[in-house]
């Protein structure tokens, strides 16, 4: 293969700026997918992606354009999925920077553009949706130069929806993005595993970018970090369906099936090489991603525990950022402590468990990792409130802080600064960019994982965009709040809070639990306590509901239907002592401070 004819590139864009639509137009214009087969968001193969209109998993497709071969590596645009973007960029030589002509540069576009610059990628700026009446391409060009610091002189103005100027984008990819200069088939194999997914018949399928050397069917290869060895059964490229080939060579992006059955054997971001004549060094600059939000996942039916374990293993194959370990709860039995990159990431995984594996789960309140300094000079990392040691043994607790970047129009500055202050934020700076401002605050991570994003969108009428980076751990006055139901402690409802917010959050949670736990044949007190001190209390009055009371006459079948429906509902409850608790009660802990103003 002529290496000078290969172009590997990604698309960088914020949510809703038209990235998946542009990918669809490229597939259509190059006839990679016929117009008849083309559906909107073609590369977004997960149902969830199409419903939410976001890209979650990255996708890689080979495109033939004239006598060139393009490898388009699709990327997500939400802050939670930055790790997917870094993997795409590591496999590319260039990036299309796509900006909405009506919205301008958003915080996540900025973060991903900086990632591309750090990777020394050639960036091609593109302004999309120029056919909209409110489009202002000249202002957006100014933002590209001022905010990102690259020339906007050759910016391409397109409409991905109609296909206007998309052909021009293809020509720019040929002219501006470098071919894989270091590609050399004669060197030892050096390939980056940038993603993986699970196939029921063939095991784990690896997505790889070959940097040097070649790999063929029947070759023995190994992962450099673990030294685990495997045998290539089949390999090929995606167009976007799988096409088998006898070998993959340097510069190419493709897939490898090697009968890998155990999720733990695959390390996304690792370097592959051949067992015979291996490379001496791994590919540089690949950081393992770190989970920042932790929650307990428990099957509603205890019998589903092995199925939940297997499901998490399978999802881990295609999402290496998820961490999970066994944990148990007196209230909920056996489950897992699962780590995520953010709240959207967590919601997506819950949806996938339900859709792909048909498992209903209870999720406990999300938490972050705290550093707990003990009186015996030991340090413990705690992400589960139940694991927090007794107050008498704690010297101090530190919590993670982040630096947040909020891009918004000037009229919303006051409301957003007020929101940041209410979240214990520390003001850093405000930068004015044309008609918009970049507000920089340092915030405790625990304050943004629940409702910060929703409130930000609400205050700014949907116009604010948000990105953040971890900075350090800082001292904090934190307390553990326990919830008692009918005088029994429910460990799944415990949470860690800043002392000044503990009362308000406890009061709100007690009210929510009162709302969602059905009345039963005895009175149920709900109490929030710190140590032995009760800080909030609500009471559920006794009541027994007869679901068939509203029927008259002898309508036996209708009566049986209602009783069956009630029985099904009870299946979805957990007994805590003598109290039946519905799944919604656990979800209300998740959302316990969503509606605070």
UniProtKB/Swiss-Prot annotation:
Keyword Secreted (UniProt): no
Stretches assigned to the tr-type G domain: 4-181
Enzyme Commission code: 3.6.5.n1
UniProt keyword terms in alphabetical order: Cell membrane, GTP-binding, Hydrolase, Membrane, Nucleotide-binding, Protein biosynthesis
Reaction(s) catalysed (UniProt annotation): GTP + H2O = GDP + phosphate + H(+)
Binding site for GTP: 16-21, 128-131
GO BP field: positive regulation of translation
Main location: membrane
Gene Ontology molecular function: GTP binding; GTPase activity; ribosome binding; translation elongation factor activity
Subcellular location as annotated: Cell membrane
A GO CC term assigned to this protein in UniProt: plasma membrane
Coiled coil: none
Gene3D superfamilies assigned to the protein according to its UniProt record, in alphabetical order: 3.30.70.240, Elongation factor 4, C-terminal domain, Elongation Factor G (Translational Gtpase), domain 3, P-loop containing nucleotide triphosphate hydrolases, Translation factors
UniProt xrefs under PROSITE patterns: G_TR_1, G_TR_2
Family according to the record: Belongs to the TRAFAC class translation factor GTPase superfamily. Classic translation factor GTPase family. LepA subfamily.
Name of the protein in its database record: Elongation factor 4
